[in-house]
Amino acid sequence: MTEVFLMDERLFKLLGNADGTPIVDAAGWLRRADEYAALIERCMLGSAPVDHAVRGETISRRPALEGRALYEIVEIHYGPHLRYSFLAHIMRPARPGRFPAITFNMFTQSYGCPRAADAIERGYVIAMFDKEQLFHDQRTHRTDACDAYPGCDWGAIRIWAWGHSKLIDYLEGQDYVDTGRFVATGHSRGGKAALAAGAYDARIAVTAPINSGCGGAGCFRVLGDRAGENGDPLREESLGRIAAVFPHWWRKGFERYGNMEPPHAPGPEHALPFDLHALKALVAPRALFSVEGLDDAWANPYGTYLTWQAAQPVFDLLGAGENNCVMYREGGHAFGEEDWGYLLDFCDWRFFGKGEPYWNNGARCLG
């Protein structure tokens, strides 16, 4: 490992209290984690309702994959009097047993998984939902989740993350689901939502953001591509740009921590009382697995590496050092067959002890 990958001093140590005293045990971290969770809600994501009531109504069910799977469309009702709803598309093995369930937030009506046959053969449920049925990805459009919970100050990322939790609320009641093995994944803005879901929902055993970048598994304070740090907001997405272009993704006020004038160069981020290693650390001791494209400069692969490193001491303190993982691959901004293969391999290893770890390869790939 070269010097460029040593812990970056701009990413403050997580194992310290607000008064500067060190955190030396799990109890101390759990108290500090509650503080970080509240900070991230207050400054970036907004708060979500604590409401696990759902009702599922099966709209259709049919065989799939030549009878090896069942494909269901379920309308999931939520909110006061269960008057609001969204659709879940669920593919599950057509054989007896309880299986890990992967919740996946999709772009509009883009249902499907390029490794569906492989996932079913390995014994996974794939549960997909269209996140825009919860909140349309537009600046001025309020949608069902906002109407259902008008007291919440959440932005779209937190609403979409909450969608994972509502889907899990339904899946917990199904006799084909192993309720100790939920996985939340998504790509790009959906990856940000998956990471937020894993940070705030302890039922999620594996959190798997894919190419999630700024506001996800990336870094606010340090920008860089596969060659290292460059601080170039025209190549890597900065806080200022994402807050200017997508203000509806965040709690109101988040924009104060970014440079809102083009080209949105870094600077005000240093006033933010956390960086994204704190969000990652909220997943601990459960497993975190991110997949990053080396040519996806916009998602800040270098900053992602730094926040991965900076979160590691928390996982170590909790006796879960092996659960903080990142996989770098060649290529750009995608969630394709290769990425699904990495995710399924990781889950096989984490849940069933199959295979050997081949991830955490950033030091070999970057710089």
Positions of predicted regions on the chain:
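Loop/turn elements at helix/coil->beta-strand transitions in domains of secreted/extracellular proteins
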Residues: 98-102, 122-126, 178-181, 202-206, ...
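Flexible loop/turn segments at secondary-structure boundaries
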Residues: 110-112, 134-137, 191-194, 214-219, ...
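Alpha-helical segments flanking ligand/cofactor-binding loops in enzyme cores
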Residues: 117, 195-196, 281
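Alpha/beta-hydrolase-fold serine-hydrolase catalytic core, especially in secreted/extracellular enzymes
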Residues: 1-85, 92-97, 202, 251-252, ...
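Primarily recognizes the serine-hydrolase "nucleophile elbow" in alpha/beta-hydrolase
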Residues: 113, 166-234, 241, 268
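Generic beta-strand/beta-sheet core signal
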Residues: 129, 185-187, 209-210, 291-293, ...
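Mobile cap/lid helix-loop segments that gate and shape the active-site cleft of serine hydrolases
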Residues: 211-279, 300-308, 316-320
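Cap/lid segment of the alpha/beta-hydrolase catalytic domain
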Residues: 97, 103-173, 213-225
